[in-house]
Design a protein with these regions (language model features):
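Short structural boundary motif marking the start of a folded domain
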Residues: 3-7
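Short linker/helix segments within small regulatory modules
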Residues: 20-32
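Short metal-binding segments enriched for Cys and/or His
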Residues: 1-2, 29-57, 63-71
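Long, contiguous alpha-helical scaffold regions
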Residues: 65-145
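Short, cysteine/histidine-rich loop/knuckle motifs that typically chelate Zn2+
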Residues: 8-13, 37
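Short, non-ligating residues that shape and space the ligands of small metal-coordination modules
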Residues: 15-19, 44-45
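A short, sequence-level motif marking secondary-structure junctions
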Residues: 21-24, 47-50, 97
Length: 145
């Protein structure tokens, strides 16, 4: 089972779904979350923060190193490593991808009851288009699609 959380950003106007691969890192590894509206409240520290299309996640690097070493991870622990390897990253491709996915499923629910094949094809078409847009916009996780 993998841990996930939905913390509010510093200004409390936005929230992001955050996923913790294999529950290796505890929730407290996220010190602060900054949305595009409140990111100016801090100076980006590359040694503790990852940036993704205007969002910043600030990690407690001591906590991250401790838990990753306990797990036997033999790799330099950086914010990029933590994020890109999924140890503490978006749940989906972006901060709100989980909600967007749920919205699409809800929207297509009537189709699912009528024609499952058409439902799956439409779901695939919509999600692939969304992923292409996320990639074009520059979302970090979407770049590997």
């Amino acid at each position: 089972m993998c841990l996930h959380q939905k913390p509010a950003c510093v200004c409390k106007r936005n929230k992001a779904y955050i996923f913790h691969r294999d529950s290796v890192l505890p929730e407290r590894v996220v010190i602060n979350l900054y949305c595009p509206e409140c990111r100016d409240r801090t100076n980006r520290d590359q040694s503790t923060m990852i940036e993704d299309v205007g969002w910043l996640i600030e990690y407690d690097m001591e906590v991250a190193r401790f838990y990753l070493e306990l797990k036997g991870v033999d790799h330099p622990v950086t914010p990029e490593f933590i994020f890109d390897e999924g140890y503490c990253t978006w749940y989906g491709m972006s901060p709100n991808d989980l909600e967007e996915n749920a919205r699409v499923h809800q929207e297509l629910l009537p189709l699912q009851k009528k024609d499952k094949l058409l439902y799956f094809n439409e779901l695939k078409r919509i999600r692939l288009a969304q992923f292409a847009e996320l990639k074009k916009t520059g979302w970090r996780k979407a770049q590997n699609i």
